[in-house]
Amino acid sequence: MTRDHNSRRNHFFGRLCKGGLLLALAPLFMASCAGDGFDDGERFISDVSNSTLSSPDANNVTCTASADGKSQTITWKVVRGAGGYLFSFYDMANLDEPIVKDSLIDGCSVTVKREEDMNYRIELRTKGNSELNNQDATETTQVTVSTFTPTYATIPAGSDLNEWFAANPIPDTAVDEMLNYDLEGGAEYTLSDVLDFDAKRVTLRTNNKTNHAKIVYTTATSGITTTAQMNIKYLDFDCSGMTNATGVFAFSKSTTVAAANTIDASKYKWSGAYIPDPISIVNCNFDNVKGYFFWDNQVKTWADNVLVDNCVVRLAPEASIGGGVFWTNKAGQINNLTVNACTFYEDPDWAFDYKYFYQAGMAKAPDLYVDNTSYSAAATNSVNYTNSTFYHVTWNNGQWGNYNGMQSKTYSYWIMTDCIFYDCSTSGSVPRRFLHGRTNQPGAKFNNNTYMNADGTFQDPGNYDTSGTIIEEDPQFANPAQGDFTISGPTQVARKTGDPRWLP
């Protein structure tokens, strides 16, 4: 059964954006026109009087992002004789709930918060000036602004992605530059075979981050593979067609490897492909995941960073799986894995399970250097779980982690903070298996985690999580059988633990 997590996600996102923008605007209404070549006198003493004013010309409205991309300054040319401007600001995906509505700006610029991958609408209407007997403008100027990186191609709704990319091959320029492929918001697509991005840098995304396109995996060979930087954003996946022997995502089996993705054999022992730039899976929902979420595909590829952020993943294996949800034990490796603000779960009565959540068998970081006495301090590896919810995963005598090449290493970092685990890692506690049974790991950090068993008791953290911050309290999930993990446990709510989308 496919579950829709969008409404909950949108509600949460909307609150954050709206609050942030309103707070950002409050101290900025006093901006002046001086930066546009007009002094204060020109705003209020003008040769324009006894007139109905016009709103600012849309061609003279500019929007400039800050250096860090977190804010944007909107400016417009002064309308002589004006008494101010009514400013409104919208998320184009949610026009019924303005971010800012009819705020009076006494000036010609305003700075607001900027979110990545958004389509905004700016509205400006000139206010009259009673001292000059000038009347309000009757029309409103509208300007749209996009913070999406430029689109390379839009794939028509209803397409089979394998057929479309076969007819429209990714150009060789994508070896050196990221190309953005957009799917249409609310549309459905199919994936009937392996979609191999090979050594090309690709972003696959919906052009509306709050109205996801859906990709349906229709066959046992459906999946997305890569040997390069890859971004998957704002998409829903129905993985019904896949099997327990395949992965939603995997390293590519292609023999094509970009020159930038090879490793200097004189420096490194690693002889396979290397992906120095991140693989990111952001703001996506996954249903009916029957096999690995990410695996090495039995290919010797080293990914420096894999990030899964703001995702919901419903696992539905059709048989017991000896591998992991993240599985890199056959040839490849992930140097740094981060799972943030995510939910991974199986239904409460699901009959099959995974042996591991994350299993990695390869050597790590400095062990891969020919001369490992002179490696850079940056040559570290890490496993990071932050603000996430895990429910009924590795419940059948499973283990949270198993790593043969990185335990007891001074350059390994283990971060597990603000997470909720329910009925997970029943063969040894979550913190024990997370640290591969090694106590006193110098790079380990725990904080505000819950480790609850299915019978209502709590796991013994032993000498693994010694933070003193463990929350032994039922998080009181609203309705796990329907994929609703909203919490009402007082301590978890107070400390804002687990996946943030489930905070009340």
Write out the residue ranges for each language-model feature.
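Bacterial Sec-dependent N-terminal signal peptides
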Residues: 1-10, 22-64, 132, 140
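Conserved aromatic anchor
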Residues: 69-81
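Beta-strand-rich modules
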Residues: 111-134
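Short glycine/acidic-rich loop motifs that flank beta-strands on beta-rich extracellular proteins
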Residues: 131-132, 192-193, 218-220, 240-249, ...
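N-terminal extracellular ligand-recognition/capping segment immediately after the signal peptide
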Residues: 158-162, 175-202, 209-218
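Extracellular beta-strand-rich solenoid/capping regions of secreted or surface-exposed proteins
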Residues: 190-203, 214-273, 299
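Right-handed parallel beta-helix
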Residues: 228-239, 275-290, 303-319, 333-350, ...
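C-terminal accessory segments
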Residues: 465-504
